Amino acid sequence: MKRDFTLFDIKSTLDYGCGGSDWSLKGFDESSNGSAKEFFRLDKCYRFEPARDLDERQKVDCVLNFDVLEHIFIADISNVINEIFSYAAKLVVINVACYPAGALLPNGENAHITVRSPDWWKAQVDNIALRYPDISVLLITSTGYMVSQAFPIYKANDWLNGNKFITTT
């Protein structure tokens, strides 16, 4: 992602569904003991985590969303993805798990309540990306612990202004 942040000149981020993460904490980069903010050369890092009453949502260069969407009820997925895009000026990075979690909810159900294939998630993100044609997208899907697939970075404008009807990314 460091290369992508440089390529898109990312200076500000919103970690949408950040849990307890803090991009300003030292120790992210083992070689320098620097923070993620320093490692990625960011000016501003904002966080959103409704479970912790943390809401710094605002327009930024890049919105990051890791291990969140699979915890969202299927009927709400498109609204959440749309909101993620609405805060991005340049890039959206989504990582979604496509397998059951190791944890259960208090009612006994799996914590990953929307487990779908990588292609299903790609279709959901593509559908919303069409509403934000100038925003680039990096979608990473995980089919197991430490097993992931990154789709090529794209933006819907490439499809809309292309000379072909078939899209392959």
Residue map of PLM features:
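Residue-level micro-sites within transmembrane alpha helices that shape
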Residues: 14, 69-70
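Conserved SAM-binding motif I beta-strand of class I
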Residues: 44-48
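S-adenosyl-L-methionine-dependent methyltransferase catalytic module, highlighting the catalytic core
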Residues: 20-26, 40-41, 51-60, 64-65, ...
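Conserved class I S-adenosyl-L-methionine
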Residues: 10-20
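Conserved alpha-helix/loop element of class I SAM-dependent methyltransferases that forms part
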Residues: 1-10
